[in-house]
Amino acid sequence: MDRIINILKTLDRPGTDKVIEFMEENNYKGSRCYGHHKYAGGLVDHSLEVYDHMMQNRGKLPKDSIIVCAFFHDLGKASKSTRQIKDHEGRSVRLLDKCGFPLTAQERNAILTHHQIEGFLNDPLRKCLSQADIDSTGRWKEANDPNYNSSLSNILKNIGLKFISKLCKVFVSESYL
C-alpha cells in the first residue's frame, strides 16, 4: 500500500489527499477482488499489477492518467465488508467525485467501461486499462479450449485484434497508441 500512496502523491490534482484518506479508512489495503485476487490484500496486488502493465504499455498516454486508471478503476471495491460490491465501476467514479477529485473525460470513460468491449478500439487509455485488467485477472482462461480459442480468435480478428492463446492476451496494433 505504501507504494500506491507514494505514487498517488505524485499527482497534482485536488482531492488526492481525500481519496488516499478514503482508501485508508475503507480498507483498500485489506480488500479483496471477486473472481480473481480473492484474498485479503488482493485489491492492492491487482492494482499494482495493472499499474505496472499500463506503464510498460502506455505509449504516449499521460502518466497521470495511467496512475488514475490503474489505482482507481476498482476503487469502488474498497470496503470494510467482505461482500461483493455491485457496479464497482460506477461506485469508483462516484467516490472520486465525492472526494472532489477531477477526472478527464477519457479517464472517466475508461474507469466506467473497462469491462466492456464496445468502443474498445476508439480510446487508447481505455484499451490500455482493459488490457492490463485482463492480464492481471486472468480472464479468458477458456483460451485453453481449442473450440473457444478458434471462435474468439475469429471474432477478435474481425474487429482488428489478435488473440494469442499461449499468453492469454489480446494485443492491439501499436498504431492505436
Q: Which stretches of residues belong to each language-model region?
A:
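Metal-dependent phosphohydrolase cores
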Residues: 1-177
